[in-house]
């Protein structure tokens, strides 16, 4: 009986040790999973930072002036993703579903918390739900204007704005398709919106926000040049004496003709259509950075501000949401992924009207 009692005690002790070991292993595995999840949770934050541009040194407190945050984002239309699935080989299908991507996009956009959000590849039937969920998440009175691509495409450009902060004075949708112009035979569009601050002391300050998504075909820079020229013609008329924030996916490298034309270098474009062309400055998102992958990590997305003395007021950039470095992009791998809902990175900038 004594031996039996010792045997039972030994069995119970062994059982307790095994349970403790299993429990410890489970806690360890759970801890590792949580740590990995935490690392993945914060990996995006480590790649992206808001960087001051130093313009506060001009004696203006950005919290007491007419400042606003703009985010521009090509969010990858689901219909286009499904049409070009071969571009996303190697990415788990769960990361490509609209439900998962929308969840990731909402999390990112709510954290960025823009006053004005410019979207490219915004699928028309997804826009109302996306905006409603943003409203529920940030409590802002969001409104929007939208322009679908010409023809049968289901995506286009949207400008979402905080209607409690801004009054929408006017907007214009521009189709970059013109039967009379040989190079303007594509379905791309642009969208303009003119805003005024609602605060009584700032009501005289107006500005224009414009967004576009130019042709993708890497061999047709001539078409993109013609599209830029048309956008500038329309912007010149629409903006009159109002400063402009121009955003979008231009599918053009920084040293390409379309971008050089925008920043006043003219490139290979005949500027006779704009006798007094608008000139812009790129809000620099950092050296050696990238916004998307096109056979290599490149920048094709931009936020720009208009320059010159034609405007009563001017836009002063206060800070920029720095893009990830090419090395970080390579390390992070393909996008969309576990945390990011698009195949582009979002751009952001804070401006003040002076």
From Swiss-Prot:
SUPFAM superfamilies attached to this UniProt entry: DNase I-like
Protein name: Protein angel
Amino-acid biosynthesis keyword on record: no
GO cellular component: mitochondrial matrix
Molecular function GO terms recorded: catalytic activity; mRNA 3'-UTR binding
Expressed in which tissues: Ubiquitously expressed in embryos.
Alphabetic keyword roster: Developmental protein
Keyword NAD belongs to the record: no
Domain of life, source organism: Eukaryota
């Amino acid at each position: 009986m004594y031996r039996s009692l010792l045997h039972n005690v030994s069995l119970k002790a062994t059982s307790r040790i095994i349970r403790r070991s299993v429990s410890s292993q489970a806690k360890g595995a759970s801890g590792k999973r949580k740590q990995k999840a935490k690392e993945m949770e914060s990996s995006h934050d480590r790649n992206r930072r808001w960087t001051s541009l130093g313009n506060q040194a001009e004696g203006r407190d950005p919290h007491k002036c007419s400042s606003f945050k703009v985010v521009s984002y090509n969010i990858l239309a689901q219909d286009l993703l499904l049409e070009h699935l071969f571009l996303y080989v190697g990415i788990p299908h769960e990361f490509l579903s609209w439900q998962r991507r929308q969840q990731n996009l909402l999390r990112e956009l709510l954290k960025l918390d823009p006053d004005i959000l410019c979207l490219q590849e915004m699928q028309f039937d997804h826009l109302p739900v996306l905006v409603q969920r943003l409203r529920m998440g940030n409590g802002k009175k969001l409104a929007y204007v939208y322009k679908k691509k010409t023809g049968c495409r289901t995506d286009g450009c949207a400008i979402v704005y905080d209607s409690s902060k801004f009054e929408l004075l006017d907007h214009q949708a521009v189709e970059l398709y013109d039967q009379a112009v040989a190079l303007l035979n594509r379905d791309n569009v642009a969208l303009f919106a003119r805003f005024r601050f609602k605060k009584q002391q700032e009501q005289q300050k107006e500005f224009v926000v414009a967004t576009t998504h130019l042709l993708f075909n890497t061999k047709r820079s001539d078409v993109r040049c013609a599209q830029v020229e048309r956008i500038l013609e329309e912007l010149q008329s629409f903006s009159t004496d109002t400063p402009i924030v121009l955003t979008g996916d231009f599918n053009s490298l920084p040293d390409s003709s379309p971008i050089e034309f925008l920043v006043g270098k003219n490139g290979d474009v005949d500027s006779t259509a704009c006798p007094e062309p608008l000139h812009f400055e790129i809000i620099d998102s950092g050296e050696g950075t990238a916004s998307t992958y096109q056979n290599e990590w490149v920048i094709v997305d931009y936020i720009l501000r208009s320059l010159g003395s034609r405007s009563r007021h001017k836009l002063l950039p206060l800070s920029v949401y720095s893009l990830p470095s090419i090395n970080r992009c390579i390390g992070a791998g393909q996008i969309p992924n576990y945390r990011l809902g698009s195949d582009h990175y979002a751009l952001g900038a804070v401006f003040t009207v002076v």
